[in-house]
From Swiss-Prot:
Taxonomic placement: Eukaryota, Metazoa, Chordata, Craniata, Vertebrata
GO cellular component: extracellular space
GO molecular function, one term: serine-type endopeptidase activity
Single biological process term from Gene Ontology: proteolysis
Keywords: Disulfide bond, Glycoprotein, Secreted, Serine protease homolog, Signal
Main location: secreted
Entries under InterPro entries matching the protein: Peptidase_S1_PA, Peptidase_S1_PA_chymotrypsin, Trypsin_dom
Protein name, UniProt field: Inactive serine protease 54
Source organism: Homo sapiens
Gene that produces this protein: PRSS54
CDD domains according to UniProt: Tryp_SPc (cd00190)
Length: 395
């Protein structure tokens, strides 16, 4: 017979283990892909598989015109850029966009009922170009739809990120002025040590490289910069593209998400539901004390390359063709880019943070990052095994 004290002790231990398992489960509620994905050179030229990057969404208007990409933070919240959705009322979130062919996959849409533009967003300088969108109903998560992790608070020692990517749709012309919403593609990015662009505060920059322009020039407004957390294989949101990336070679800027972590969490908490419940993964991670995210690489740019950026900032017209949901017919839809005027902000606002370059190949190239299902992690196997042994021994 087991004593009451023994039962009490076993009950407490079982409770502690259940709490640990609860934290473990909640920590996998973001940044997890449901299948192992091969990263590196492959014959498919960077095609995104159906279960890869399930947090990337398309923001569209009531006529199903693509406005910008976005990134899922939770069942209700999507992060994107302010410049593409300002002064708009009717926006829908299209999920599972790895393949936009309606004959192959049905796409679910979620109407947006709340749009939060950063209060200090400047349409001239494009500073604070970030926005939150809340869906009317909770997005249903599955193999094709998941949330990505992001830092909900600033850390003294930043996490070590690796294997960074951006994604987008292929341009259908050599100039990149036209784009067909079809199969999503991806491009690897890496750090640079210098950038010729004028950068506002809380932005970073990167570029395409000449050698790989035969594939595609990706990176449209709102497209997330996605990186893996070293040793954990969790995907973390690094930034959202601001503008650029349409010409090859060419430069692009993106908004650094971690600098807006307080703004994101506070706005979501005020409007509800909050995002704090999704950040247990931060507590379980022992961050590395090594330097920046990745190896720094020098790169210089010619006047002709910088000219591509200038032409972009003067404004472009882009025609987007895609399949309307539930309809096999294709509509040709125009999206006119807004002209970017001269900045009214003081030059003192600029800083020199890190930057990224498309098509790098040092980290993650030619490797298989197994364990997108985090139950393959050694510490989790030990924990689960311990729980099973404990329960079996108490039967």
């Amino acid at each position: 017979m087991v004593s009451a004290a023994g039962l009490s002790g076993d009950g407490k231990m079982r409770g502690v283990l259940l709490v640990l398992l609860g934290l473990l489960y909640s920590s996998t509620s973001c940044g997890v892909q449901k299948a192992s994905v091969f990263y590196g050179p492959d014959p498919k030229e960077g095609l995104v598989s159906s279960m890869e990057f399930p947090w990337v969404v398309s923001l569209q208007d009531s006529q199903y015109t693509h406005l910008a990409f976005g990134c899922i933070l939770s069942e209700f919240w999507v992060l994107s850029i302010a410049s593409a959705i300002q002064n708009r009322k009717d926006i829908v979130v299209i999920v599972g966009i790895s393949n936009m062919d309606p004959s192959k996959i049905a796409h679910t849409e979620y109407p947006v009922n709340t749009i939060i533009i950063h209060e200090d967003f400047d349409n001239n300088s494009m500073s604070n170009n970030i926005a939150l969108l809340k869906t009317d109903t909770a997005m249903h998560f599955g193999n094709l739809v998941q949330s990505i992790c992001f830092l909900g608070r600033m850390l003294h020692t930043p996490p070590v990120l690796q294997n960074c990517w951006v994604s987008g749709w292929n341009p259908t012309s050599a100039t990149g002025n036209h784009m067909t919403m079809s199969v999503l593609r991806k491009i690897f990015v890496k750090d640079l040590d210098m950038c010729p662009l004028y950068k506002l505060q809380k932005t970073e920059c990167g570029s395409h490289t000449k050698e790989e322009t035969k594939t595609a020039c990706l990176g449209d407004p709102g497209s997330p910069m996605m990186c893996q957390l070293q040793q954990f294989d969790l995907w973390v949101l690094r930034g959202v593209l601001n503008f650029g990336g349409e010409t090859c070679p060419g430069l692009f800027l993106y908004t650094k998400v971690e600098d807006y972590s307080k703004w994101i969490t506070s706005k979501a908490e005020r409007a509800g539901p909050p995002l704090s419940s999704l950040h247990h993964w931060e507590k379980l991670i022992s961050f590395s004390h090594h330097g920046p995210n990745a190896t720094m690489t020098q790169k210089t740019y010619s006047d002709s390359e910088l000219g591509h950026v200038g032409s972009y900032l003067q404004g472009q017209r882009r025609t987007i063709t895609h399949s309307r949901l539930g309809n096999s017919s294709r509509d040709s839809l125009d999206v006119r880019e807004k002209d970017v005027k001269e900045s009214g902000r003081s030059p003192e606002a600029s800083v020199q943070p890190l930057y990224y370059d498309y098509y790098g190949g040092e980290v993650g190239e030619g490797r298989i990052f197994a364990g997108q299902n985090r139950l393959y992690q050694p510490e989790e196997i030990i924990l689960v095994s311990f729980v099973l042994v404990f329960f079996c021994s108490s039967i």
